[in-house]
Each structure stands twice: as structure tokens, then as C-alpha cells.
Amino acid sequence: MKLKFSYRLKKTLLRAATLFCAVSTAVAMTACSDKGETSTVQLSPKETVEKIFTLAKIKDYDSLAEYCRSFSKMSMELYFTDTGTDYDAKWLSRYSATLASIFDNYVTYDNLTEKADKETRTGSVTGTFTALDMEKFNEKTDSKINSEFKNDYNAQMDYIDSVIGDKEFKSKEFEYTIEFKYVNEQWTLTDKNFLILLTLGYYNK
């Protein structure tokens, strides 16, 4: 099964299960939540991004669901459904743990700057990020997975988990702009799968 996460980890972590993409957004939304709810706290776009990273680091996925999809089993399931990725529900816990490990090892942010215009109901946060370098990751793991673990999903995931943490798979710093909409008197992300795709290096162009 090939975890299809990053429309490119789609090859390796969900590749490994089709990994989430090989391991684990894309629609405009008015609420960034697994339950369709929005945060009751009125944060600016920059404060929202900082809050998301704080909650992700402490693994408070229930609170994080008020802002965007995270690394919970429910988020993984919704992400796979959104992206048309085949997955086996019994492996959701493992997908979640692997993606959380990728976040812990590779994702950083710095130099956040904000633009917010309530009149046009648009906002953005631009920053410097690092994430998983999916191209390098796939180059390193594809051959071994296909030759040695092709029909053994457990072995694929064990191998993937064993190489997460290698510094060579951390991307160089890249700039990215996170888009927001002002809806119902609060700022919400336009991309509900932002955190998952950032983690998988999808925005590192």
C-alpha cells in the first residue's frame, strides 16, 4: 500500500502504505476543523500560525482540530478522503505516529510576517520554514522498499520509521505564504490540510 501523503509522499509513506502519501489540502474553507467547528478565540493570522505550531509540538490534536487538520487518526482519515488516497483504517494510528515524527524532526518556522485586511476579508502570513525533503527521502528509500519490502507493509513502515531523523532529509529553508480568509469575524486558514502538506514538504518548491 503506498501511503499518498504529499501528493509526492504519496509515493513513499502511503507508498509504504501508499505512506501517508507514503507516510500522512486543499479546499477553501470557512472552518478549519475535523468537526467543522471554528475556534472561539479571535486570533490574528500570525497568532493562528503560532498557535498551530505550539499545539502540534505538544501533540494537543483535539485543540489543533479547531484550526486545521493535524496528525490525529481522524485527521488522517479525512486527509486521505480529501486526496482520494487508498488507505487501510487499521493502520491509521501508525500513519499518525509516523507523520507526527516527521513533524518533530524536520519542521521549523521563523520570521513570520502578517498581512490582514478585514475589508477585503483576506490575510496571509509569510515565513521561513523547513520540512521533510520528500525528493531526497524518496530517492533514499524507494529502491529498498521496492526490492526488499514490496509485499510487507509492516517492514516498509519499520524501515521508514528507522530513517526518520536523519539530517539529510531536512529541507533547506524556504519561504512560503499561508493564506487566510476573514469569515464570521475570525481569521481561518483557506487550506485545511496546511499542516500536513507543510510537514511533507509539499510547499518546498
Predicted feature residues:
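Bacterial N-terminal signal peptides that target proteins for export
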Residues: L3-L19
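Surface-exposed, charged secondary-structure patches
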Residues: Y87-V163, G201-Y203
